[in-house]
């Protein structure tokens, strides 16, 4: 949904006039840029997303128009990164967030970063609208690499993945294979371990002898008050599982 909210909030666009955009109309107007609109903003995107998807399904909005909005927003993002990149003083990366999730709000988000100065990048990013399965993202990155476009995916907030970020099965419930491991490692060889929304290092349930295992824990699935399953959600445990697999060869 890259660029969609900004377009829907702008008077004079087809998005603005669509009934599905009512929640975000004028949300960025000067009179609304204050803390009193925080409650509205926290609710606006979810409603806009659901209503807009329904409008696409019912053909009340043109999916081609939405695609053109995303392409323009992506071009603006690339231009901003290029404009502000000042090596040695301020480094920018051309990238975006792939926001996949499980049906129960388990977080499967990745930051996707492209190598270089933007001379060779895709015309539009791969999103959950293309596929909600990370395997689809990695296969897309492989295809880009064949065209000379190098990229890197960085999983983040695995702590909120409900056990799916480092599950011992793929997205379709199949056992992990050598081909799966190679596909994943080719495209996301690193992982974020900590950030403001909690650490993804370990959990007291997984590291019972580590007195620091409860440091900066955010135990919920992202944007919910539902507990996230620890097993399969933390990096240290994932590393141990990987070592077991390697030793079992």
Stretch-by-stretch model annotation:
Residues 1-249:
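Extended, charged catalytic domains and RNA/DNA-binding interfaces, predominantly
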């Amino acid at each position: 949904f890259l660029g969609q909210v900004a377009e829907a909030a702008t008077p004079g666009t087809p998005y603005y006039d669509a009934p599905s955009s009512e929640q975000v109309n004028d949300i960025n107007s000067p009179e609304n840029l204050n803390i009193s609109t925080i409650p509205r903003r926290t609710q606006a995107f979810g409603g806009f997303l659901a209503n807009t998807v329904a409008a696409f399904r019912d053909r009340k909005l043109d999916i081609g128009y939405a695609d053109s909005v995303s392409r323009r927003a992506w071009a603006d993002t690339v231009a901003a990164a290029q404009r502000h990149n000042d090596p040695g003083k301020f480094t920018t990366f051309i990238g975006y967030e792939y926001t996949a999730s499980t049906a129960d709000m388990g977080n499967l988000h990745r930051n996707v970063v492209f190598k270089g100065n933007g001379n060779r990048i895709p015309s539009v990013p791969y999103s959950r609208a293309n596929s909600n399965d990370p395997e689809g993202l990695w296969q897309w990155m492989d295809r880009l690499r064949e065209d000379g476009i190098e990229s890197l995916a960085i999983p983040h907030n695995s702590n909120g993945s409900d056990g799916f970020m480092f599950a011992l099965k793929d997205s379709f419930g199949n056992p992990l294979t050598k081909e799966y491991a190679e596909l994943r490692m080719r495209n996301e060889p690193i992982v974020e371990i900590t950030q403001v929304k909690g650490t993804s290092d370990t959990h007291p349930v997984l590291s019972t002898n580590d007195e620091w295992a409860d440091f900066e824990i955010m135990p919920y699935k992202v944007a919910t008050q539902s507990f996230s399953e620890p097993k399969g959600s933390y990096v240290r445990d994932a590393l141990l599982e990987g070592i077991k697999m390697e030793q079992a060869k």
